């Protein structure tokens, strides 16, 4: 057999797989289904080996499951709309569509060179009309259900990307895409009412037993459930009431002021007319502050007195109403009751503005005098509830307030509605028109898709580029036929990715986004693989859209992903791979040098796949040496003539035991989780064991039948990880079918039985000999064997005082 030439072998088998259609998944089968999905990429450039990691992981699982007799759905596509592709296109002065589709061609070629077993007949590209027609359809379904609405709102604005951002796309006050500090703009924007699903999104996390706990914790924290009470404060000399949400109703007797968020609609209504001019200056001043820093504990507290007072509903005391920078609309109702004795931010505000500080919880410990106390204690200065223990007494306080109509029990969430409007070109159009006569009108389903025009000046200006395109904008009203204008914003790309896993089931249907019977068969996804950075964005939005479609009757399941695996990153020189850092490792270069199978196996061998790993050139060289060594071993075995050796000598029994131990271990590691590194290690050990056998025996004593058994099972086991290598060897062994169509091998329990064991013989605790004994030997038989040993007898003088036997390990003779 010629030497290992990966480029020739891999090209040969990739053509074979494509010609035979081996990756194509039948829609219906008698086999159980298995939906294996990796998160699809943004095609904003070529792939590096960091991107490749999850594709290799997914393919190992898909190939293994096929061999375990599953009908495996393993599709691929491209998250082709959005800022990354658009910004890259702008930098290169090329149209986003041309840039994106060219990149898709490159990425597709890269992935095919890796031998990933995707069903390319199911490929989806979100920027094509055949896909975004149904993204628009989903928008209409939410609109019809009252879950899509438009309002003027203070939104996160990235001055570099020139577009609004959802809260989830802002990290530490900066745009997650370009790291630019985010500002605030007031714009008419479209929102999806994800807050209506906050409780279900939170509670149903408990159903996701196949998800990593840290991902569920991230979602729980983002949804941010708070249990407490809503309390109504009457505004003095007014019909107005201010509703406040608090998790500490037990501190109500300690309220000495009230604070409104600057963005609250109440501010203008409550402020005295003669103070409106000063108010406007204050609001403009606060508007220049970083809203995300405003919410931090260490921000300097600044306020403006509205001139009005509210009435404390339990004490009847007048409390001044302020507007303050440290209160945000994102929390509760945008109004906060100031309890300076028991909230540090309120304390700092009260000290600055000389407001009363009234203790109503007696601390259970000594505290500094210049700090608020927010721990447990006993209620004091609290009227009829004096002496109530906190926090146990909070429930009693709520009941007392409810009985008197002062408060009502409430659950609030930190989660805010999903802002989906983008003032950019490269996204799915929003299917809404505006008619002077009929107002806001949805585009009829039969008129979809609203096509994104090609000839557009798409450089970001802060205004939606489609606003300037009359050919796109000007249309007729679907209701009255009169002149109308299309909505000029496009949808957030996370809308596209919130349902793509459904489209893979019926990608060619142009009359429906998916067939219910088919998605109900294939979904939920059995195994989803992707980065943890999507825990709060894509994964949360996908769960929301799935629940909406379930409620509307389009799906029979309400969670999209049954099991989730989050892979670690691959670093180079201690940093995440990026072109700007010059530390990118190209998969094409690695494939040209070592072959795709070596690259695949090295990625899987780098360590536990959920952890980050450092790329090491010596590491891939080591895996390349292993594959060539395994190739040479298989070459020797394949060239041997068949024989019918039936009786196994001790050497054969040992090697056969090693083979079936490997089979059991590899199977357990594949079934028990993503332990690919230990799988590869087991395969390496098996090759070493085989070489130990053939190197220590003359060839005429080799048990050829055993070696052929080892070679066959080795090739089957390695095939999910090095599929081209396995196919070539399988063919050279004389098999006519693809190794992909073979069943996963089963280990032989009888081969694992150890007939003899070696035990240590000690005299007074010192090792004197090692002897082999039958595995079923009795203790007396073992003592007899030990006492007959020449190495032991020279240390024996008379009858032993004591003999200690540790079964199957050692015998200690004590004199």
Curated annotation (Swiss-Prot):
Record-listed E.C. numbers: 6.1.1.4
GO biological process assignments: leucyl-tRNA aminoacylation
Tree of life domain: Bacteria
Any GO molecular function: leucine-tRNA ligase activity
Annotated residues for binding of ATP: 579
Cross-referenced Gene3D superfamilies: 3.10.20.590, HUPs, Isoleucyl-tRNA Synthetase, Domain 1
Signal peptide segment: none
Xref: CDD domains: Anticodon_Ia_Leu_BEm, LeuRS_core
GO cellular component: cytosol
Reactions it catalyzes: tRNA(Leu) + L-leucine + ATP = L-leucyl-tRNA(Leu) + AMP + diphosphate
InterPro entries: aa-tRNA-synth_I_CS, aa-tRNA-synth_Ia, Leu-tRNA-ligase, Leu_tRNA-synth_edit, M/V/L/I-tRNA-synth_anticd-bd, Methionyl/Leucyl_tRNA_Synth, Rossmann-like_a/b/a_fold, tRNAsynth_Ia_anticodon-bd
Ranges spanned by the short sequence motif 'HIGH' region, renumbered to the chain: 41-51
A Pfam family annotated for this UniProt entry: tRNA-synt_1
Keywords: Aminoacyl-tRNA synthetase, ATP-binding, Cytoplasm, Ligase, Nucleotide-binding, Protein biosynthesis
Short sequence motif named 'KMSKS' region, residue ranges: 576-580
Compartment annotation: Cytoplasm
HAMAP family linked: Leu_tRNA_synth_B
NCBIfam families membership: leuS_bact
Family, per entry: Belongs to the class-I aminoacyl-tRNA synthetase family.
Protein name per Swiss-Prot or TrEMBL: Leucine--tRNA ligase
Organism field: Pseudothermotoga lettingae (strain ATCC BAA-301 / DSM 14385 / NBRC 107922 / TMO) (Thermotoga lettingae)
């Amino acid at each position: 057999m010629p030497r290992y030439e990966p480029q020739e072998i891999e090209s040969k088998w990739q053509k074979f797989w494509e010609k035979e259609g081996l990756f194509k998944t039948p829609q219906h089968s008698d086999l159980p289904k298995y939906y294996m999905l990796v998160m699809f990429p943004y095609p904003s450039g070529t792939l590096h080996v960091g991107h490749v990691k999850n594709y290799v992981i997914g393919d190992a699982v898909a190939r293994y499951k096929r061999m375990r007799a599953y009908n495996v759905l393993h599709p691929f596509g491209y998250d082709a709309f959005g800022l990354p592709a658009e910004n890259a296109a702008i930098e290169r002065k090329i149209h986003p569509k041309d840039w994106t589709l060219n990149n898709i061609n490159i990425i597709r070629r890269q992935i095919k060179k890796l031998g990933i077993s995707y069903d390319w007949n199911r490929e989806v590209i979100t920027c094509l009309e055949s896909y975004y027609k149904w993204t628009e359809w989903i928008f209409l379904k939410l609109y019809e259900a009252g879950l899509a609405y438009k309002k003027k709102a203070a939104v996160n604005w990235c001055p570099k990307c020139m577009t609004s951002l959802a809260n989830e796309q802002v990290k530490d006050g900066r745009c997650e895409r370009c790291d630019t500090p985010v500002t605030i703009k007031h714009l008419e924007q479209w929102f999806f009412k994800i807050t209506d699903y906050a409780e279900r999104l939170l509670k149903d996390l408990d159903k996701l037993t196949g998800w990593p706990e840290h991902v569920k914790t991230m979602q729980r924290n983002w949804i941010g459930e708070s249990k407490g009470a809503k309390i109504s404060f009457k505004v003095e000399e007014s019909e107005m009431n201010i509703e406040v949400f608090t998790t500490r109703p037990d501190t109500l007797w300690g309220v000495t002021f009230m604070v409104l968020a600057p963005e609250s609609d109440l501010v203008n209504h409550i402020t005295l007319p003669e103070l409106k001019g000063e108010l406007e200056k204050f609001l403009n001043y606060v508007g220049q502050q970083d809203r995300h820093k405003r919410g931090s504990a260490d921000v300097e507290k600044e306020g403006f007195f509205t001139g009005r007072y509210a009435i404390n509903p339990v004490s009847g005391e007048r409390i001044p109403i302020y507007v303050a920078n440290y209160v945000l609309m994102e929390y509760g109702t945008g109004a906060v009751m100031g309890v300076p004795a028991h909230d540090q931010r309120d304390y700092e505000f009260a000290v600055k503005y000389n407001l009363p500080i009234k203790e109503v919880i007696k601390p259970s410990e000594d505290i500094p005098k210049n700090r608020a106390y927010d721990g447990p204690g006993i209620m004091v200065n609290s009227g009829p509830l004096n002496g109530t223990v906190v926090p146990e007494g909070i429930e009693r306080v709520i009941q007392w307030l409810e009985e008197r109509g002062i408060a009502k029990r409430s659950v609030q969430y930190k989660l805010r509605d999903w802002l989906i409007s983008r003032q950019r070109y490269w996204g799915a159009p929003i299917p809404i028109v505006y008619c002077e006569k009929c107002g806001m009108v949805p585009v009829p389903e039969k008129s979809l898709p609203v096509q994104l025009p090609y000839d557009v000046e798409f450089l970001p200006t802060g205004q939606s580029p489609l606003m300037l395109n009359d050919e796109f904008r000007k249309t007729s009203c679907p209701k009255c036929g009169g002149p109308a204008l299309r909505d000029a914003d496009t949808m957030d790309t996370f809308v596209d990715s919130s349902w793509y896993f459904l489209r893979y089931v019926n990608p060619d249907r142009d009359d429906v986004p998916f067939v219910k019977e088919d998605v109900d068969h294939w979904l939920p996804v059995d195994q989803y693989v992707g980065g943890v950075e999507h825990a709060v964005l894509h994964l949360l939005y996908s769960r929301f859209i799935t629940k909406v479609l379930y409620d509307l009757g389009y799906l029979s399941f309400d969670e999209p992903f049954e099991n989730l695996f989050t892979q670690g990153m691959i670093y180079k020189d201690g940093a995440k791979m990026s072109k700007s850092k010059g530390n990118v490792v190209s998969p094409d270069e690695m494939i040209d040098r070592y072959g795709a199978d070596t690259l695949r196996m090295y990625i899987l061998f780098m360590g536990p796949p959920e952890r980050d790993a450092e790329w090491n050139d010596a590491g891939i060289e080591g895996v390349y040496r292993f594959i060539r060594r395994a190739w040479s071993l298989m070459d020797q075995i394949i060239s041997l003539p068949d024989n019918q050796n039936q009786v196994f000598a001790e050497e054969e029994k040992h090697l056969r035991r090693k083979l079936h131990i490997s089979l059991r271990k590899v199977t357990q590691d594949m079934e028990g989780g993503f332990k690919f590194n230990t799988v590869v290690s087991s395969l390496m050990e098996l090759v070493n064991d085989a070489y130990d056998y053939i190197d220590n025996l003359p060839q005429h004593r080799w048990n050829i039948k055993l070696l052929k058994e080892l070679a066959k099972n080795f090739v089957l086991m390695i095939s999910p990880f090095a599929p081209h290598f396995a196919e070539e060897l399988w063919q050279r062994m004389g098999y006519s079918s693809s190794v992909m169509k073979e069943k996963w091998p089963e280990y032989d329990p009888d081969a694992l039985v150890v007939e003899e064991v070696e035990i240590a013989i000690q005299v007074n605790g010192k090792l004197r000999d090692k002897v082999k004994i039958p595995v079923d030997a009795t203790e007396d038989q073992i003592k007899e064997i030990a006492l007959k040993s020449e190495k032991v007898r020279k240390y024996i003088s008379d009858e032993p005082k004591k003999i200690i036997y540790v079964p199957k390990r050692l015998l200690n003779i004590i004199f």
